[in-house]
């Protein structure tokens, strides 16, 4: 699979700006959502090739978003990479158990984001 369109979900405007810069520098399309509900709707309407998903968000957290995406046949195969300050081994293991294909700890490192994109 070739990644052409990336959805980034984070309730932090600063994090979205940073990831947007990285994604655009790789000549990819960038779309964003700032909460879980919008993330699910955006994933269904935009059908991105990859989702970078924050774990800690108000309302619906990243794990709940992941479960909803996996329930829907249209979105269940979109790879999700969690991006979070919750980066202890237990958090990473839980993310993998939820179906995540990768994990990038915050603060965000440009190389880590680009490596995740290259995986797909």
Give residue spans per PLM region.
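C-terminal output helix
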Residues: 17, 108-117
């Amino acid at each position: 699979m070739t990644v052409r369109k990336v959805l980034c979900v984070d309730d932090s405007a600063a994090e979205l700006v940073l990831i947007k810069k990285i994604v655009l520098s790789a000549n990819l399309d960038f779309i964003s959502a700032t909460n879980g509900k919008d993330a699910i709707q955006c994933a269904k309407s935009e059908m991105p090739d990859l989702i970078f998903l924050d774990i800690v968000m108000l309302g619906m957290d990243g794990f709940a978003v992941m479960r909803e995406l996996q329930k829907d046949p249209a979105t269940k195969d979109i790879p999700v990479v969690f991006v979070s300050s919750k980066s202890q081994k237990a958090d990473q293991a839980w993310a993998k158990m939820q179906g995540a294909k990768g994990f990038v700890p915050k603060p965000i490192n440009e190389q880590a984001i680009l490596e995740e994109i290259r995986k797909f």
